[in-house]
């Protein structure tokens, strides 16, 4: 079995309502995302000797993750304060992305993993999500 990975970069704003530090304030990150795929090689056809064509992986991640999330305010739809901020931003024609969980690196990594594995049927082995150049979370099942 082979493992291949591709890295992506995107920017998002968020806050962690109720956090006991600076992250309770609205702030942003340049996230680095590493998507790792595992599998056997195609035996024939245009993709012969590949696990997945890197350009196909790039297109899927762009469509499912980057296009909706890049330069958005990601917020917890179950949190009143974050939802109010999102409503204001939407009225000002700013991009938002709502999720039903607290927007920690850990939960975002799990969300991305599940979106790619279950929604797109990719054989994801792990997701790494860097929130800063020195801090990342890895999620795998």
Curated annotation (Swiss-Prot):
Signal peptide feature range: none
Protein name: 6-carboxy-5,6,7,8-tetrahydropterin synthase
GO biological process: queuosine biosynthetic process
Other information: The active site is at the interface between 2 subunits. The proton acceptor Cys is on one subunit, and the charge relay system is on the other subunit.
Annotated EC: 4.1.2.50
Sequence similarity: Belongs to the PTPS family. QueD subfamily.
Active site feature: 23, 71, 131
Keywords in alphabetical order: Lyase, Metal-binding, Queuosine biosynthesis, Zinc
Keyword set includes Lyase: yes
Cofactors named for this entry: Zn(2+)
Catalytic activity: 7,8-dihydroneopterin 3'-triphosphate + H2O = 6-carboxy-5,6,7,8-tetrahydropterin + triphosphate + acetaldehyde + 2 H(+)
UniProt xrefs under Gene3D superfamilies: 6-pyruvoyl tetrahydropterin synthase/QueD
Summary of the function given for this chain in its UniProt record: Catalyzes the conversion of 7,8-dihydroneopterin triphosphate (H2NTP) to 6-carboxy-5,6,7,8-tetrahydropterin (CPH4) and acetaldehyde.
Coiled coil feature spans: none
Naturally occurring in which organism (per UniProt): Haemophilus influenzae (strain ATCC 51907 / DSM 11121 / KW20 / Rd)
A Gene Ontology molecular function term of the record: 6-carboxytetrahydropterin synthase activity
SUPFAM superfamilies named among the record's database cross-references: Tetrahydrobiopterin biosynthesis enzymes-like
A Pfam family annotated for this UniProt entry: PTPS
Biochemical pathway: Purine metabolism; 7-cyano-7-deazaguanine biosynthesis
Binding-site positions, Zn(2+): 14, 27, 29
Record text on cofactor binding: Binds 1 zinc ion per subunit.
Ribosomal protein listed as a keyword: no
Name of the top EC class for this enzyme: lyase
Entry-linked InterPro entries: 6-PTP_synth/QueD (IPR007115), 6-PTP_synth/QueD_sf (IPR038418)
Superkingdom: Bacteria
């Amino acid at each position: 079995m082979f493992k291949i990975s591709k890295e992506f970069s995107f920017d998002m704003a968020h806050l962690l309502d109720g956090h006991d530090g600076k992250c309770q304030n609205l702030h942003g990150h340049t996230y680095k995302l590493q998507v790792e795929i595992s599998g056997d090689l195609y035996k024939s056809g245009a993709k012969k000797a590949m696990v997945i064509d890197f350009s196909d992986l790039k297109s899927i991640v762009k469509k499912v993750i980057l296009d909706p999330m890049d330069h958005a305010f990601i917020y917890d739809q179950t949190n009143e304060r974050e939802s109010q901020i999102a409503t204001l931003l939407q009225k000002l024609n700013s991009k938002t992305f709502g999720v039903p969980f607290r927007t920690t690196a850990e939960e975002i990594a799990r969300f991305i993993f599940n979106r790619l594995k279950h929604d797109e049927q990719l054989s994801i082995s792990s997701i790494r999500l860097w929130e800063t150049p020195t801090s990342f979370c890895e999620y795998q099942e």
